[in-house]
Amino acid sequence: MKNMISRRNFLAAAGVVAAAGVLTACGGSSGTAASTASAAGSTAAAASGDTIKVGVMGPLSGNVSVYGQAVVNGATLYLKQVNANGGINGKQIEILTEDEQGDATQAVNCFTKMVDEGMTALIGDVTTTPTLAVAAESADYNMPMVTASATAEAVTYDAETDTVNANVFRATFTDPFQGIKMADYAYQKLGYTKAAVIFKKGADYNEGLAENFVNEFESLGGTIVDQESYSEGDVDFKTQLTTILGKDPETVFCPNYYEEVGQILSQAESVGLTVPFLGGDGWDGLEGYATNDQLKDTYFCANYAKGSNPEFEDAYKAEYGQEYPNGFAPLGYDAAKTVVYGLQAAEDAGLEAGTDDYKQAVIDAIASGTIDGITGTFTFDEHHDPVKQTAILTYVDGKPVLKEMF
């Protein structure tokens, strides 16, 4: 049986329009009452009126805002659909939306602010480092929390202590899962036996995918001919790419986010490194950052492939006046579905929103439930990670298309 983690232990281990709310950014000393919020106060606020307060947070500004906007839009779309269909047992969902600007400290401030405003459950955060910080804070409140897209294993589970973060779930697959899947695909499906890796050091997402790709590829019998890294803020990768070129790989695994991937692909072409590149879900949004030729024969894994759910895609376009931007929007939608699944169980049990029993009922329902999501039907394993297939995508004329489910 897995241990359930406390806030203290987690801290040690981890080191867009609201339906009835407003969008704000959270400053550490902006004059809000967030820093003095109490669990008792939040319970009273959550239980007031005929609404259920749900927090939705992400980086709506900053260098990863393309992900945050997509997640928040996807989640908000589903919550508004629930409200339009009568809410949950007649209660409307009040959406508390916060911009954490891609910063872990801001993310905790946003979380605490929403607790003070009476949040009953949280959809968020989006990227790994802020999510780790919020998950640590959320444990003290046993706040039901579903991240759409944070992939680090430690968000839900500490492997060193074999401890599950009891109140936290995710709709996406993990860093280890992605690294292992792409190694399997490279070796078993594409037939590559020699691979190199280039990744950003000191970044949870990048290092997590890289480590698991290397371990899995070698366990299958493949050879990692080179591992190159770079630092936050670097924009010139030619030295690393030239070194990789000299090691004669058949493919390069590049588990980085789309803006850096675009630069790396361009510079790889300039130094004569033309072997196929592989990546993780951070590649989602890459189109426009690399040429069609640079994207040819590349592959990456994702939770969702365009065209998989026309009903969702049409609804997103109708709501926001544009096509969904990347696979993070469907994940936001499914994270919201997961939260509502839990809220429905708590409401059906006649519990009072915001109370300890209510929050535990939400958590228990999610842990044992089956979610009919648009990224697939999924359950949760003992680590609170979804059990589902992954989509392998490639690029055709510069656009990502589904190659196969794997």
Name the predicted role of every residue range:
Residues 15-19:
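Hydrophobic helical h-region of N-terminal Sec-dependent signal peptides
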Residues 2-11, 27-406:
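Extracytosolic ligand-binding ectodomains
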